[in-house]
């Protein structure tokens, strides 16, 4: 099921939410519309809903995103991250991370200009072995909060990381079973 601009988000209708990204103009449009879905999305996340958010989706789940022209776009603050975007170089290339919680290695391809910083109580999706990750400073990539899996892996995260895809599907299935019990 797709949710378009100006449509409501009903948390009960979804087992897994996929939230992708876009260019700055599109993110500006989505950021404004997302404020109307904010409470329902936060409820879904806090009720252990499963979310996979890539790049712009990751950024807009956070507190704010500063685009390339310096405009600050409010996120929905579902996760404690912020993204700054005033940088001369993009972070591009293959990336490898290790998720110590699950004992898994994830592979991907990153291509982003924003630099994302995790709040003190946020866990990364993994520690960077190769590549840049969220920024060039703290050597972590993505964010994992409850059943929310955020990443800058464009290339394609679930296809290249079957164990992560299986974990996400099983988490959603278990959540559905517990709701129906």
Where are these regions (language model features)?
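N-terminal beta1-alpha1 cap of cysteine-dependent amidohydrolase-like domains
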Residues: 1-47, 159-181
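Short coil/turn connectors at secondary-structure junctions
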Residues: 13-14, 47-49, 71-74, 103-106, ...
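Structural motif
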Residues: 16-20, 52, 152
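Cysteine-nucleophile active-site neighborhood
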Residues: 23-99
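Short, acidic Gly/Pro/Ser/Thr-rich loop/turn segments
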Residues: 24-26, 86, 115-118, 156-160
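A residue-level structural signature of the nucleotidyltransferase/glycosyltransferase Rossmann-like core
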Residues: 50-51, 108, 141, 150
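Pocket-forming structural segment of enzyme catalytic cores
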Residues: 66-141
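A glycine-centered loop/beta-turn motif at secondary-structure junctions
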Residues: 135-171
């Amino acid at each position: 099921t797709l949710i378009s601009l100006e449509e409501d988000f009903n948390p009960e209708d979804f087992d897994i939410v996929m939230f992708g990204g876009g260019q700055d103009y599109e993110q500006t449009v989505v950021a404004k519309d997302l404020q109307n879905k904010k409470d329902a999305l936060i409820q879904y996340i806090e009720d252990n809903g499963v979310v996979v958010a890539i790049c712009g989706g990751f950024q807009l789940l956070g507190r704010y995103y500063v685009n390339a022209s310096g405009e600050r776009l409010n996120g929905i603050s579902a996760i404690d991250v912020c993204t700054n975007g005033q940088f001369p170089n993009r972070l591009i290339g293959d990336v490898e991370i290790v998720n110590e919680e699950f004992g898994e290695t994830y592979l991907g391809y990153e291509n982003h200009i924003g630099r994302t910083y995790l709040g003190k109580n946020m866990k990364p999706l993994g520690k960077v072995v190769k590549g840049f990750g969220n920024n060039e400073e703290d050597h972590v990539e993505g964010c994992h909060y409850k059943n929310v899996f955020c990443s800058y892996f464009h290339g394609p995260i679930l296809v290249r990381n079957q164990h992560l895809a299986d974990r996400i599907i099983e988490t959603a299935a278990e959540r559905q079973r517990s709701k129906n019990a």
